């Protein structure tokens, strides 16, 4: 759980950078930031335990995949709004993970 929270923290920071790069028209850096975000989302998906997690894990995987798809769109369309959408989804998920951590820790 600690690793998930660390990944989420890095992901949210990198999403902010990607958004800033779009607004600043720094397209090469935008691409690097979005690629880092996608790598982190893929790592989060890889960490899911599909054998034991049931429907919750399947839904998390779908949410992560949706975020990856939206980031590809954000990159191609230079859309800070799509990055904002991803940040909103992920901030809600992060709150859930933090709440779980508080109950377990």
What spans do the regions from the language model cover?
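N-terminal intrinsically disordered, cationic/polar leader segments
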Residues: 1-17, 22-24, 28-35, 42, ...
């Amino acid at each position: 759980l600690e690793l998930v929270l660390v990944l989420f923290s890095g992901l949210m920071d990198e999403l902010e950078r990607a958004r800033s790069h779009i607004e600043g028209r720094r397209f090469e850096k935008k691409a690097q930031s979005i690629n880092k975000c996608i790598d982190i989302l893929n790592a989060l998906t890889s960490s899911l335990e599909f054998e034991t997690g049931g429907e919750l894990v399947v839904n998390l995987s779908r949410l992560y995949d949706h975020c990856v798809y939206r980031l590809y769109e954000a990159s191609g369309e230079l859309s800070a709004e799509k990055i904002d959408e991803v940040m909103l989804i992920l901030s809600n998920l992060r709150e859930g993970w933090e709440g779980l951590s508080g109950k377990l820790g």
